[in-house]
């Protein structure tokens, strides 16, 4: 059997299993203290499951999933669909650090709209010269700066999805270390190419992508994962940034630096798990 994913909402996990049953794919739900794990019986069906899982994660409340439960008869189980609350879902799948960073980014973004980008960057941007090196918050605070609504929405969506599961499964301390280290190195990498005029959480997000994906591949028992299709999309997005296909100003060096840091940290943290499975 292959572990597919861990989901904090047991009812939604069962809905996905029921839906895949209509596609003639046998999955098994294993409840745990933080929700449920979904396991696949036939390894050869993994690519199909990963593809469907990507669609499910984008829209887990789509009526087709509940309809599948009706079709399978599993609505008679003690797993009722509760009234959906975005706030409840947001909180249930994120720890205190995940939520705190989201609130901080939103507060800083609002402040930037009020007083202007320049005023906020003068306090929070990457150190301009050695006179600012001792203002140690600058080595990390640049990650909380966002310059458009699309910029902050995209980053916070990924942050919530990746940091949330990491904090829930591996603890706040592990997430804090990765956040600080990746913010430091991604900021340093970007400063070599663009000076200090940059900001955003994307370097940290790419570190999370690398960490969560590789940890899921090498140590699935730790309960965090990123589907390979989403990881491939993220890499393609990174490559597109270098060729300016999308016409956006993208901090490519921060993305690459963050991704490398995340992969290296995951490789180190899973070195013993990899040896055990060999």
From Swiss-Prot:
A molecular function (GO) term: serine-type endopeptidase activity
Catalytic activity: Cleaves type-1 transmembrane domains using a catalytic dyad composed of serine and histidine that are contributed by different transmembrane domains
Key word Cell membrane present: yes
Chief location bin: membrane
Subcellular localization: Cell inner membrane
Database matches in InterPro entries: GlpG_N_sf, Peptidase_S54_GlpG_N, Peptidase_S54_rhomboid_dom, Rhomboid-like_sf, Rhomboid_protease_GlpG
GO biological process: proteolysis
Stated name of the protein: Rhomboid protease GlpG
Native source organism of the sequence: Yersinia enterocolitica serotype O:8 / biotype 1B (strain NCTC 13174 / 8081)
Lineage start: Bacteria, Pseudomonadati, Pseudomonadota, Gammaproteobacteria, Enterobacterales
């Amino acid at each position: 059997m292959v572990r597919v994913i861990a989901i904090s909402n047991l009812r939604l996990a069962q809905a996905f299993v029921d839906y895949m049953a209509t596609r003639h794919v046998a999955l098994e739900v294993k409840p745990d203290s933080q929700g449920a794990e979904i396991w696949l019986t036939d390894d050869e069906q993994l690519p199909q499951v990963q593809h469907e899982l990507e669609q499910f994660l984008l829209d887990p409340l789509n009526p087709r999933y509940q309809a599948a439960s009706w079709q399978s008869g599993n609505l008679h189980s003690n797993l009722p669909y509760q009234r959906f609350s975005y706030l409840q879902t947001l909180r249930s799948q994120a720890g205190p650090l995940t939520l705190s960073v989201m609130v901080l980014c939103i507060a800083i973004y609002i402040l930037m709209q009020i007083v202007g980008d320049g005023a906020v960057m003068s306090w929070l941007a990457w150190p301009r010269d050695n006179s600012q090196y001792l203002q140690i918050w600058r080595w990390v605070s640049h990650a909380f700066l966002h310059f458009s609504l699309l910029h902050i929405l995209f980053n916070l969506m990924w942050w919530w999805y990746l940091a949330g599961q990491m904090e829930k499964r591996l603890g706040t301390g592990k997430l804090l270390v990765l956040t600080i280290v990746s913010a430091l190195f991604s900021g340093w990498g970007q400063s070599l190419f663009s000076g200090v005029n940059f900001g955003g959480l994307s370097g940290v997000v790419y570190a999370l992508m690398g960490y969560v994906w590789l940890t899921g591949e090498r140590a699935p028992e730790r309960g965090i994962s990123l589907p390979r299709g989403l990881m491939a999309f993220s890499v393609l997005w990174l490559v597109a940034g270098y060729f300016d296909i999308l016409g956006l100003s993208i901090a490519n060096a921060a993305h690459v630096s963050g991704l490398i840091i995340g992969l290296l940290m995951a490789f180190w943290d899973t070195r013993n798990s990899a040896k055990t499975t060999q």
